[in-house]
Amino acid sequence: MQLSTWNINSLTVRLPQVLEWLAANPVDALGLQELKLTDDKFPHLELEAAGYQCVSHGQKTYNGVAIVSRLPISDVVRNLPNFADEQARVITATLATAQGPLRLINAYFVNGQAPGTDKFAYKLRWLAALTEWVRSQLAHYPRLVLMGDFNVAPDD
């Protein structure tokens, strides 16, 4: 199984590159981050024409995540159910593989800024909620992949 992840920094701008890359690299699933578009603007038709199913959790101007897959997608959850958040940072889905269900969590991690700031505190709360979500999913799906843009540095 081949999985890839890509912080696309605007799917509207980079859709031609995504389609070209997928044609040259026919991965089973691709996690996209920083879509910078709402779900109603997501290019489902173009990606489906290239042979991919897709689910998205978009947000205008910032954030946004998607899963693009050659495999059937089900059981989609947008955001973290245990964390009230307006930012579109997580999408979770199950892929039907020949080896059985694979739970895929695609996340655009918070960039926390410097320790002691409100953004850093938000990042720590978000990471705790993500950890809880991953643990709950592992209890039901022993085959799980956490992918995305982790935005992790030693001090922020």
Give the role of each language-model region:
Residues 6-11, 79-82, 121-124:
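Short, flexible loop segments at the rims of nucleotide/cofactor-binding pockets, characterized by
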Residues 20-22, 90-99, 129-142:
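Short amphipathic alpha-helices and their capping/turn segments at secondary-structure boundaries
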Residues 1-10, 101-113, 147:
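Active-site-proximal beta-strand elements of phosphoester/diester hydrolases
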Residues 35-38, 42-114:
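Structured beta-strand-rich core segments of catalytic domains in phosphoester-bond hydrolases
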Residues 117-133:
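Binuclear metal-dependent hydrolase catalytic cores centered on His/Asp/Glu-rich metal-binding motifs
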